[in-house]
Swiss-Prot record:
Region annotation (Disordered) ranges: 1-29
Protein's recorded name: Mitogen-activated protein kinase spk1
Residues modified to Phosphothreonine: T199
Enzyme Commission (EC) number: 2.7.11.24
Molecular-function GO terms, alphabetical: ATP binding; MAP kinase activity; protein serine kinase activity; protein serine/threonine kinase activity
One Pfam family recorded for the sequence: Pkinase
Native source species: Schizosaccharomyces pombe (strain 972 / ATCC 24843) (Fission yeast)
Keywords: ATP-binding, Kinase, Nucleotide-binding, Nucleus, Phosphoprotein, Serine/threonine-protein kinase, Transferase
Amino acid sequence: MASATSTPTIADGNSNKESVATSRSPHTHDLNFELPEEYEMINLIGQGAYGVVCAALHKPSGLKVAVKKIHPFNHPVFCLRTLREIKLLRHFRHENIISILDILPPPSYQELEDVYIVQELMETDLYRVIRSQPLSDDHCQYFTYQILRALKAMHSAGVVHRDLKPSNLLLNANCDLKVADFGLARSTTAQGGNPGFMTEYVATRWYRAPEIMLSFREYSKAIDLWSTGCILAEMLSARPLFPGKDYHSQITLILNILGTPTMDDFSRIKSARARKYIKSLPFTPKVSFKALFPQASPDAIDLLEKLLTFNPDKRITAEEALKHPYVAAYHDASDEPTASPMPPNLVDLYCNKEDLEIPVLKALIFREVNFR
């Protein structure tokens, strides 16, 4: 990936080896990584909702990798997320999207208990970096640019990530950023050409776009741009912009900054319940982003305004944002590739059939794991 300026680095980046991680300790049975002899486990680096990650050495190449061990067979939703992530990450070949290097096949269908996905080893994530050191404006620009570069590829393929947040943005000591965790991704267009309908739960609350909270019906690529705005704000201030404790507090926090929606924006809200709730709130004036982020540059403030626009129809797109002056030092139209369209049926993958029996889903996963 070319850049027009020298890139920032993360101080002591090699000292933090936790990448896809939380601070919880995994259960003992999760620590049993059954790796083929060409891999040597180095150490545990993280735990997620239904899997753990270890650093390992691929002995034939000498390459250090991350091995993600997923146990999806306790719930159909975990199976569907695993299938979706494998299909999507195999589709994308992009510098700012985490790639699958290999999937370790089980000896047989009967012995398929866990799924082992081999990925690039990243040293940390943006969540940890924000909380461990102040970020310069150069850091904020470069990370924002790389997020937008990944979104351009995803959105050109007709894919919405739907769960962008700092912990899903993996980093190395050179500040290379890769978007991870595609388990909640969806197609922007359902079969038949109609906009996709939102499922009830998408995205971690603090990064959810208002159209998700207020039931605008259709979801679009714009929800990822809202999340990007929340992430940029968090990088600039070292704290979340909208840390809502529940649905109502989340809406209140958003409106306390963006102000009461205009009539035009209000008309986009389809849910009668949501419209009634908004009407019940007192009028709130918009707060200046410059007042909220006094140290931020005018370009950073302007991009924030365009990303954190209430109405998704008026929100800046990834392709437009890449041309914004805030990321001009890195923008290179010839090095910001699109991706081939992803068939909607592969992205949405039984999204309305989450009552599928686990044996059926296990067979689909077995077929996907053994696909070469």
